[in-house]
Amino acid sequence: SIGQGEVTLTPLQIANLGATIANRGYFITPHVVKEVEGEALDTLYSKRRYTMVDRSHYDEVVQGMRAAVLGGTCRGANLPDIEVCGKTGTAQNRGKDHSAFMGFAPMNDPKIAIAVYVENGGFGAVYGVPIGRLMIEKYLKGQLSPEDEAMATEIQNRRIDYGIHER
């Protein structure tokens, strides 16, 4: 893909694309809720919306996203015991590149789909992938490993040089 200029999608829209791929062709319209107190949700909030793309095409994309985590630009998202699928993105602009990652897990029983977008963060693997890894691990395991706690601290202490032109 070609990534020049600014991205016109929101992170929520990118995450919903990831959910559509993870679910092999359907998504649930995102909603913002304050809380759910044990009452049955209106079906409006859980209605599956299907694309017109054959499931077999999604299976191919999922395999590619898994391969990216096992040996491609998303290697940093690989977690023990969790089959993570992902795609990096690098958007060139007037300043430093933007770092993006879209992913979901587990591959065959998806529970989480995420998007990470860090303006001026560099290549997708620099910020997007490690932040995505931490989010997936925390959500699915409830806590980070000691190594990933250290990674989280290191990422929090990084400094992004906004607006610095690299080309």
Regions found by a protein language model. Give the residues of each.
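Gram-negative outer-membrane assembly/targeting C-terminal domains
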Residues: 140-167
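Active-site beta-strand/loop architecture of penicillin-binding DD-peptidases
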Residues: 1-50, 56, 62-146
